[in-house]
Structures are given as structure tokens and as C-alpha cells.
């Protein structure tokens, strides 16, 4: 995959002042993307939520979630991401006013938290469960067909992995489109996907196949063969069609497998997702 962001790792941040300074520095400047990730203790009271630091005391637990959000909201960076693996972190993005809780997230801000405002965050084998799933998602588990990993994809990956009775991740955003946080090698080369319009002249058109598409249907292979025999041009197309089937863009028509669709002179067609990518290719968007 692609290299990560320019990363600054800070371990054992001991004071509230130091953590506040690091958050300010993270969202300073005018870069395209700034991402703040915190894994540690969280606290909530009648006033709001906190990222707890070791120097905490009663009524002064650490950096408030409202301060973190205000810093991100006021940042000149184009896209601001806040990812929190701490107890009660789902309170992030809300303020209490006269007994009511209101969401206040400026444009360009995205928040992903390990749990809801009333939940603790589970730890297992030295890792927060949320962080372990986050790492899996960034390693490719949350990648789309093109290999892009977006905040929405990460949330969907983590959401599916956690059961209804476990801690629930929270996703809040105010953006017009998702930014890719990382790119990994896609399951199918982009060149193959871009040829989808070569094989299907229209998104609802089926591609007729015959035995010449199956590479093993050749007199050179010691088994029963059917005319027309394997044709190199068609077998090359068939190979790519099978790859597109593997990522859910193509399905055989009238048969369970692409092999039998070819050998029985059936056809294949685009799935609903395949039609979406057909339109993207047709309109030169990928």
C-alpha cells in the first residue's frame, strides 16, 4: 500500500498541558489533511467528556472533548480527522447547553470513536478492541475495489465486527466527499476494471460467451473438448471477466459458474455494483 501520513508518535504524554499543545500542533498549518488519534483513558461528567492525562485531579480530568473539537473546527486544514479509542468518546461532537445536547461539527471535520458516550472501551491483549480493528481496516480490510480506504469504509468494517451487545463505534462527519486515508494494492488491477466498457458496450448489455472462452477447451488438453475451441483472444477476455466476477462486478447468466456459462454458450452480465463502476469508467472518472 501507500506510505502513511507524515506521522508523529507521542507515547506517555504526562500532562494535560502537553496533550493540549500536541493537539494544537496537529491541527496547525493549512495542510490538506490533519489526523489526530488518541488511545487512552476517557471520562465523562455532567459538564462533558475528557481525554484523561496522568496528572488528573478531581474536577480537572484532562483535555475536554469540546476543546479538541474547537481546535479542529477552527483549523485551516482542509480535512480534519479525530479518532479516539477511549471510554465515553462518543460524546465528542456534542455540547451540553441548558440540559440539552447539541451536535456542532464544522465542515471538513470527521470523528470516529471507539464507543458511545455511555460506554467504556474494551481492551484485549494490550490493545483496545477498537484499535485492533482499526489497524486491520487500514491494512486493507476496509479497502474498496480500487484499494482506497476511507473513514466511512473504516467505520463500516469496525461496525460489522462488533456485535449489537458490545461497545458500538460512533461516526460523525460534515464533509461533501470522503478523502482516502490510505491506498492499498487492489484485488484486481485498475487496468482490468477500466476495460469493463470494452466487454460491455452498455451497462445493461450481456456479453455472449461460448466454449472458445474457456482456456482448457483445447485439443491440446487430454479431455473432452467442444467447438469452438479455445481462442487466445477470448480466453484473455475470460480471464479478466473471472477476476471481475471475483470482486462482485460480473455474474454468469443461467449458470452458477463462469466456466459452465462459457462451455454452455451462455452469457454474463454486470451486477448492480458492476454497473456503478461501468458508469465511472464510461465517464472517465477512474
Where are these regions (language model features)?
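Short amphipathic alpha-helical interaction segments
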Residues: 230-252, 265
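Caspase-like (clan CD) cysteine peptidase catalytic core
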Residues: 17-95
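Short beta-strand elements in bilobed, periplasmic/extracellular small-molecule ligand-binding domains
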Residues: 1-10
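Short, basic/glycine-rich phosphate-binding loops at helix/coil junctions
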Residues: 2-3, 46-51, 111
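Active-site-proximal C-terminal subdomain of hydrolase catalytic domains
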Residues: 81-172
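Accessory beta->alpha helical hairpin/"wing" motif in late/C-terminal subdomains of nucleic-acid enzymes
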Residues: 251-286
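Short glycine/proline-enriched loop/turn "hinge" motifs that connect secondary-structure elements
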Residues: 1, 44, 102-106
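Caspase-like cysteine protease fold
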Residues: 143-230, 265-273, 283
